[in-house]
Amino acid sequence: MNIFKIFFILNYTIIFLIKIYQNTFSKLFGQQCIYKPTCSKYSIECLKKYNFLTALVLMTLRTIRCNALFKGGNDFIPKYNPISTSLKEFQKRLIK
């Protein structure tokens, strides 16, 4: 099995786990995310659009930003240079 198949399977396994989270814990506790789309939807979109490692970096940065120290609002997946764009968003949205 080559590395691309492994990452493909890993992507869809994580998507499956996120969907379980969305249908259980998210419904129990309500939406707490300060962004649109929510962090779980953002993560699914990242996993579908980018390779596993890029998606992992984007999901991690987004999850770290989802708290009271950052400005919420619309935050869509970057179309170009996803990691550098996400890092710029990280700095831009930090409440100083």
Swiss-Prot record:
The keyword tRNA-binding does not apply. One of its GO terms (cellular component) is plasma membrane. It is found in: Cell inner membrane. Could be involved in insertion of integral membrane proteins into the membrane. PANTHER family: MEMBRANE PROTEIN INSERTION EFFICIENCY FACTOR-RELATED. HAMAP family: UPF0161_YidD. This is Putative membrane protein insertion efficiency factor. It comes from Borreliella afzelii (strain PKo). The lineage of its organism: Bacteria, Pseudomonadati, Spirochaetota, Spirochaetia, Spirochaetales.
